[in-house]
From Swiss-Prot:
HAMAP family: RNApol_bact_RpoC (MF_01322). SUPFAM superfamilies: beta and beta-prime subunits of DNA dependent RNA-polymerase. One of its GO terms (biological process) is DNA-templated transcription. The RNAP catalytic core consists of 2 alpha, 1 beta, 1 beta' and 1 omega subunit. When a sigma factor is associated with the core the holoenzyme is formed, which can initiate transcription. Binds 1 Mg(2+) ion per subunit. Its cofactor is Mg(2+); Zn(2+). It comes from the Bacteria. Zn(2+) 1 binds at C60, C62, C75, C78. Zn(2+) 2 binds at C818, C892, C899, C902. This is DNA-directed RNA polymerase subunit beta'. It catalyses: RNA(n) + a ribonucleoside 5'-triphosphate = RNA(n+1) + diphosphate. It comes from Streptococcus pneumoniae serotype 19F (strain G54).
Amino acid sequence: MVDVNRFKSMQITLASPSKVRSWSYGEVKKPETINYRTLKPEREGLFDEVIFGPTKDWECACGKYKRIRYRGIVCDRCGVEVTRTKVRRERMGHIELKAPVSHIWYFKGIPSRMGLTLDMSPRALEEVIYFAAYVVIDPKDTPLEHKSIMTEREYRERLREYGYGSFVAKMGAEAIQDLLKQVDLEKEIAELKEELKTATGQKRVKAIRRLDVLDAFYKSGNKPEWMILNILPVIPPDLRPMLQLDGGRFASSDLNDLYRRVINRNNRLARLLELNAPGIIVQNEKRMLQEAVDALIDNGRRGRPITGPGSRPLKSLSHMLKGKQGRFRQNLLGKRVDFSGRSVIAVGPTLKMYQCGVPREMAIELFKPFVMREIVARDIVQNVKAAKRLVERGDERIWDILEEVIKEHPVLLNRAPTLHRLGIQAFEPVLIDGKALRLHPLVCEAYNADFDGDQMAIHVPLSEEAQAEARILMLAAEHILNPKDGKPVVTPSQDMVLGNYYLTMEEAGREGEGMVFKDRDEAVMAYRNGYVHLHSRVGIATDSLNKPWTEEQRHKVLLTTVGKILFNDIMPEGLPYLQEPNNANLTEGVPAKYFLPLGGDIKEAISNLELNPPFKKKNLGNIIAEIFKRFRTTETSALLDRMKNLGYHHSTLAGLTVGIADIPVVDDKTEIIEESHKRVEQITKQFRRGMITDDERYNAVTAEWRAAREKLEKRLIANQDPKNPIVMMMDSGARGNISNFSQLAGMRGLMAAPNGRIMELPILSNFREGLSVLEMFFSTHGARKGMTDTALKTADSGYLTRRLVDVAQDVIIREDDCGTDRGLLIRSIAEGKEMIESLEERLNGRYTKKTVKHPETGAVIIGPNELITEDKAREIVNAGVEEVTIRSVFTCNTRHGVCRHCYGINLATGDAVEVGEAVGTIAAQSIGEPGTQLTMRTFHTGGVASNTDITQGLPRVQEIFEARNPKGEAVITEVKGQVTAIEEDASTRTKKVFVKGETGEGEYVVPFTARMRVEVGGQVARGAALTEGSIQPKRLLAVRDVLSVETYLLGEVQKVYRSQGVEIGDKHIEVMVRQMIRKVRVMDPGDTDLLMGTLMDINDFTDANKDVLIAGGVPATGRPVLMGITKASLETNSFLSAASFQETTRVLTDAAIRGKKDHLLGLKENVIIGKIIPAGTGMARYRNLEPHAVNEEEYLNPTVEEEGNEETTEVVVDTAVETVEETVE
């Protein structure tokens, strides 16, 4: 076999008969499989050892030669070669077909490749192949048409008319084979090119399709007649195994049944031909042979599938490849691995951020080889076998060895579903008792894990390189930021938030208020001995706290609380003292009002200060982000652990619980409800009198009850006690929100019926009072709908992620700078008055394209090609700049990927992105992962939607990425100019909008009900929407340029996500949208050798034009094509990637005809053939590096090998598409 890492590319072609014979080790002549008595393979059968190799290692069939010393000898008695039994997975056989047979993929696929080659309809082909009609192969001197079809009866009549031998007509695949041999590719191609110059309409479309197929045959060197099989390959027996079950029965692969049918029919046909049987019998047998081969290649493609026992359709070769259970997705793209385990997870509150708890019995099994090696190395036993016995006995000595082996050996933990890269992280194992894995509470958010019975899988990286990668790139303590938005993903939650909230509360008049302490220890001692309360405001000598004070502040007393002294204790030294929960204190330090000169009146100073709110979840998130910005990962993860411990400790001390008495009662609830009842009665009266319509009545009633609920909510908020545990949980962000609170204490309010419409009868009770039976029944509708929606949308969201990953998996950072001369002009994204994404957010972490100057002073804020940091972005916006030209993925010139400058910073690390980063996959995960939140959140918003026809949530995201025609489509103008008139036409129920511009006039028909976006006299740009709704991107592309469409799609995706409160970096959406507009359709080939109407990569198109322009010819013209992500995935240059995505047979059929070469540039193709992926440390520049310990000098000045210095060989994998199993020569 070929070394997989020496591959450069892989090609798939049609197999010629001679090729199939060269693969074969012998002909399979009999349908027998295994002898039922001896259980040995039958001679010349489907499992023959002579053809396929021995069933036992180094042993021939008759047993004359045993042992490895006879390797390579062919036994003179039984004819079996003495070799490894593994060859039974590699050696193929063949069947010599007694009549040619058509290959169903080429005759039945859409479009029918055979039909296009011969210019015959698939219907006519089918009649000929299945012996229902004759086709004229050579009319000779008769007036019959070449390739004309005639029935049996017509054929006889023509024979009588013109005489025997006056023309040649045949039926069956043999006839088609003769016709295919007659095809003169060069001549046909030339004729079609001529025809295209004049053809229009349907004729033109057909000519383009035929030209495409004929050109593919011509360029690839495949012969059209190879689509007809004269010889059928038999795949190796170990790929279609036959196993004995207990009870003497056999379980066999369906392929064996299908091969047996073919062999039986073939042998019967041979016998009939020997006997010179009547023509009709031979014909029938040939037709049956054709059907048997069809079933073997693709059962069920034509007619009824062949069924096995229990009328189950048999799985043919095509089914072995297709779908989730097919070869590609089941065995090649992901395999089950050894050194792995899974268990339930439990919380590990005492763990450090980089640790996880692994049960002892799991660890000993996972690390068995390492333990065994160490046992032998310590001379406890002499050999590995004895060491294994020692481990399996559970000897006392192994546990100490295990402790040492796992030290600094990271393991990977994974939770399904792995929606983004944080679904697999590395930890250092800590041995624990019990059987559950222990997980650090802070990484739960990244995994989306909780401890209600979730399970996780654990994997052990074995090699030194794998361990190094796990430790350096995947350690959980390093993953502070979320790759989708660059915000911290490990913020404290629940108890941790509550503890820190309680700790930083301030109260007036508690014991010890006004005391002054010389340092932290004295304050803590006073608190421990009960002299001062955590929340009491006290003074402390400023210079005793190790913080960045000014000289003036150092000699004063700081007014704070003991809780805040403890809270600031865990913060890094360089951070200001945190007294107020706001960003100003975090960045600039404590305000002056909290400092008291020595000897000042502390009681008076305290009484003049207002009470500060405590630190909530959001504040903690901001603190973590700031610390990450200043101190990076190591310090941040240490702080997070300290914050976690402090939070747990103080939420325990606070003893916050929830009792029924903690739910407050609203005194005037009855009056509020009475008032609403009266108003609803008035509304109903108005309706009965015919003053309002039913819809108006319904809207008024629901609005009234909504108002009642809000009124109660306001009362609750106004009267709430800040020390009420439920209020504290809600206010701190630990759990629950105001809506939960008002359902407990106010009223539940309006509910949705099963059809989604809001019911007019509200639930007046709250959970404290308890619901009546009817109210309880009403609430169940919403709960049930919530559950079903969640289940359905999870699947939708997962499928969206899969399509996104597929289309962008080969987008990798390939170079430092592509040197593009284009940039993207960006401004903030807004919808009406609502800001969707500010300019500051969009600028952060990108490179500028042009110099940015202050609009008033003209001073340079930032030069071209410079990285815009958070501070620079703020400076640009504060200067009043409204639009900036930046480097963007849209305008990047890098082939097969993006360059570092056009991408900007890697949001997951906050640093500039490195070459080799798989940004396509990251982008796909960042958009797909929040998909589940989208849909679920659309149902939480109550009320009647104002414009129901506009899609929202996940369906809208799918609509955008699949480039579908949107629901509620807006009418756009193709003319830039002024709206001169809007006329209403009552008869057709439409409006007409007239736009006049320099280039001409436009008249647009708009539905009567559409809401207008423009008014008479208003100016409109080309491609501007005249009505409310979504613009159809393909129509916009026809009117405007590619960049406008890309910008529009980017804005639309952001609108959906941001409206649901999900933040995603622009660059992720840019990567996906760019993949949708990578192709060009050739409109006029000029002097290039491109074909008209072909869809091709924009880079290849440019290259072809470059060559022609250099030679002084006329370049080709093309039109950019916007494709949905599914279509874009299938149109990728890699046939391996496309075939493993969807429509496997269609992709492979097409690839084989074209003789496609896969250059293995993406990730999927390399995973499929088992080669290291060309991203990250798998890029050529990191290969062949020996891992070793380095000294400091070497570490600071590394030497990196340049790309492209490895030897690679071109490997042509010539695949008979019939036997899709790869055979590499």
